[in-house]
């Protein structure tokens, strides 16, 4: 078997926003499965239900609701404790399966009033817009991080609403995608020729390239197979990047375990039927 050894992982960079790591001794199918799990199977919290009580802005209600759903919310401290709303015993919403937000803004000045994620008031200090995190403790921490614009109001216009954030994952809707981007490459020097460059010498080199400065791509390797994968996982801010990776691998492991259990039951049932 070409990949009989256990896969190995090496982290090359870890910041507040992204993590870069290398996985070796595996194949392309496994590597791509991991990438897809990062995007679609890691649960976070996002606004899913909106009741608009007053809206005299230029945007229709559905535009407002859509924008609210895409505002990333901090989920690190609560996502594992919150139930999915479909599994909760409550009739609509409760603290066990949701977080309530309110917004009440009216423009009384001649100057345009920007309604942003900062105006969203949460009933839980653990679930707030990512851009509002740590503002109360140190207002200088996020000076360069602008609040997310929802709508602009002119004098006399108002927006008043109530919303509930729920737990979900990216396979249901993009607002539950914890990543801003997930990328991996496996042939930094293009030795496999899976990519054809019109002018290789003009193409920017990968940060993982091992070629000399005067070389544009490696010699063609017709028998080569991808077995080393360079990942870059960027978080949208809802979860720390390392939390995304660990949660994704845990979810993938559970899926494989459930599949193994189900297959074992099927095999035992067939054996009993034959006997």
Curated annotation (Swiss-Prot):
The keyword Endoplasmic reticulum does not apply. Residues 203-226 are annotated as: Disordered. InterPro entries: DNA-dir_RNA_pol_30-40kDasu_CS, DNA-dir_RNA_pol_insert, DNA-dir_RNA_pol_RpoA/D/Rpb3, RBP11-like, RNAP_Rpo3/Rpb3/RPAC1, RNApol_insert_sf, Rpo3/RPB3_RNA_Pol_subunit. GO terms for cellular component: cytoplasm; nucleoplasm; nucleus; RNA polymerase II, core complex. The keyword Nucleus applies. GO terms for molecular function: DNA binding; DNA-directed RNA polymerase activity; protein dimerization activity. GO terms for biological process: transcription by RNA polymerase II. SUPFAM superfamilies: Insert subdomain of RNA polymerase alpha subunit, RBP11-like subunits of RNA polymerase. Keywords: DNA-directed RNA polymerase, Nucleus, Phosphoprotein, Transcription. It is found in: Nucleus. The modification Phosphoserine is found at residues 124, 257. PANTHER family: DNA-DIRECTED RNA POLYMERASE (PTHR11800), DNA-DIRECTED RNA POLYMERASE II SUBUNIT RPB3 (PTHR11800:SF2). Belongs to the archaeal Rpo3/eukaryotic RPB3 RNA polymerase subunit family. Core component of RNA polymerase II (Pol II), a DNA-dependent RNA polymerase which synthesizes mRNA precursors and many functional non-coding RNAs using the four ribonucleoside triphosphates as substrates. Component of the RNA polymerase II (Pol II) core complex consisting of 12 subunits: a ten-subunit catalytic core composed of POLR2A/RPB1, POLR2B/RPB2, POLR2C/RPB3, POLR2I/RPB9, POLR2J/RPB11, POLR2E/RPABC1, POLR2F/RPABC2, POLR2H/RPABC3, POLR2K/RPABC4 and POLR2L/RPABC5 and a mobile stalk composed of two subunits POLR2D/RPB4 and POLR2G/RPB7, protruding from the core and functioning primarily in transcription initiation. Part of Pol II(G) complex, in which Pol II core associates with an additional subunit POLR2M; unlike conventional Pol II, Pol II(G) functions as a transcriptional repressor. This is DNA-directed RNA polymerase II subunit RPB3. The gene is Polr2c.
């Amino acid at each position: 078997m070409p990949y009989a050894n256990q896969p190995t992982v090496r982290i090359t960079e870890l910041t507040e926003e992204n993590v870069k790591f290398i996985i070796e001794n595996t194949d392309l199918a496994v590597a791509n499965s991991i990438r897809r799990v990062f995007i679609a199977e890691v649960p976070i919290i996002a606004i899913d239900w909106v009741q608009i009580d007053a809206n005299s802005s230029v945007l229709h209600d559905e535009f407002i609701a859509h924008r609210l759903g895409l505002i990333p919310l901090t989920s690190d401290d609560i996502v594992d404790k919150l139930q999915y709303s479909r599994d909760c015993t409550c009739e609509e919403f409760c603290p066990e399966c949701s977080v309530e937000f309110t917004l009440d803004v009216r423009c009384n000045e001649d100057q345009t009033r920007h309604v942003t994620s900062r105006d969203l008031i949460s009933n839980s200090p653990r679930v707030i817009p990512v851009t509002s995190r740590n503002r109360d403790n140190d207002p200088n921490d996020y000076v360069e991080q602008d609040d997310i614009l929802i709508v602009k109001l002119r004098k006399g216009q108002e927006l008043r609403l109530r919303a509930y954030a729920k737990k979900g994952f990216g396979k249901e809707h993009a607002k539950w995608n914890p990543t801003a981007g997930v990328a991996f490459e496996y042939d930094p020097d293009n030795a496999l020729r899976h990519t054809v460059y019109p002018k290789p010498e003009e193409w920017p080199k990968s940060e993982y390239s091992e070629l000399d400065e005067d070389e544009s791509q490696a010699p063609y390797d017709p028998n080569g197979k991808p077995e080393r994968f360079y990942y870059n996982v960027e978080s949208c801010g809802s979860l720390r990047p390392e939390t995304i990776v660990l949660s994704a691998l845990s979810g993938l492991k559970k899926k494989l375990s459930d599949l193994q259990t189900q297959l074992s039951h099927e095999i035992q049932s067939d054996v009993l039927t034959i006997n």
